[in-house]
């Protein structure tokens, strides 16, 4: 499992997992050679333009696939992004899907969004994503994070968020939500 992380904040909470800060072939091979079945690649792509993000994710996908073929190991990507729903979504997941399918011949027929960051007070309850301020949970779309000039959004629920960010390519009514009790 190759986790691409768009910002260094989240990786501060991982334990006993390697976090690589480049995607050179030797580095990716190190990840594949580990005993762990998972490693992180810190892309810092939240600070990139869409063009820079596209270039980086295409490069990473190509290197990961090349190393996977050389080592005879299968792989899958996870795109880890901001717990307040900012970032290059859906661009990054679309690029990873396109490259993975082209490189492996396998089809990805779905995507899982799982916004949660306990340490930062980010929770999703009944399909609404919240940011904790003190003891109060505020819907993320009502916070300053949703007003971000680059990655802003107005959607109140996760299905609406998907529809908004995909510009209607995926309708809110077609999003399946699974709540934990």
Residue ranges and their predicted role:
Residues 21-28:
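Alpha-helical scaffolding within the catalytic cores
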Residues 41-46:
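Short loop/turn segments at strand-loop or loop-helix junctions that form parts
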Residues 1, 5, 12-15, 28, ...:
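Cap/lid and interdomain-hinge subdomains that line or gate substrate/regulatory clefts
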